[in-house]
Amino acid sequence: MFPMVTEFMNYGQQTVRAARYIGQGFMITLSHANRLPVTIQYPYEKLITSERFRGRIHFEFDKCIACEVCVRVCPIDLPVVDWKLETDIRKKRLLNYSIDFGICIFCGNCVEYCPTNCLSMTEEYELSTYDRHELNYTQIALGRLPMSIIDDYTIRTILNLPEIKT
């Protein structure tokens, strides 16, 4: 008779445990019910990126001293720096600077270690093209400042999503 009672007690404990697990899952589901959807209508609405967002690299040709620190700290040796040594002034003169964003991993090492701060990260993240060769940006394309999302009048920006008050 006692084995039957212990089996009935185990069955009761398992039932209570299962009900508790179902209740925990249901509470998590209910906690998410008050939140607004995370998805946005992408081409027409854009989220404002954070200050530390690592987007396309901006390059200032006049500040660059062709020291090639960016190439040495890049984990994939990506920036291509062409320079010529000016013998009369004993300095390097930058001829060409390019970065292939099809290969870039956007780690930000080049920006962090640049001694003259000629490199910076922008908030531009729309770099998609139909041809991968168009992702190879020269100093002219790198020097172009992107239009700020905040200043774009055709797009509704989402600064802070309003919360539902209960």
Swiss-Prot record:
**Which segments cross the bilayer?**
none
Entry-linked PANTHER family: NAD(P)H-QUINONE OXIDOREDUCTASE SUBUNIT I, CHLOROPLASTIC
The Gene Ontology biological process terms listed for this entry are: photosynthesis, light reaction
What InterPro entries does the entry give? 4Fe4S_Fe-S-bd, 4Fe4S_Fe_S_CS, NADH_quinone_OxRdtase_chainI, NDHI
Q: Name one GO molecular function term.
A: quinone binding
Q: Which UniProt keywords apply?
A: 4Fe-4S, Chloroplast, Iron, Iron-sulfur, Membrane, Metal-binding, NAD, NADP, Plastid, Plastoquinone, Quinone, Repeat, Thylakoid, Translocase
Q: Residues in domain 4Fe-4S ferredoxin-type?
A: 55-84, 95-124
Membrane topology, as annotated, equals: Peripheral membrane protein
Q: What class of enzyme is it?
A: translocase
Q: Which domain of life is it from?
A: Eukaryota
Binding-site positions, [4Fe-4S] cluster 1: 64, 67, 70, 114
Cofactor binding mode and count: Binds 2 [4Fe-4S] clusters per subunit.
* SUPFAM superfamilies in the cross-refs: 4Fe-4S ferredoxins (SSF54862)
Quote the Pfam families the UniProt record gives.
Fer4 (PF00037)
Q: What is this protein called?
A: NAD(P)H-quinone oxidoreductase subunit I, chloroplastic
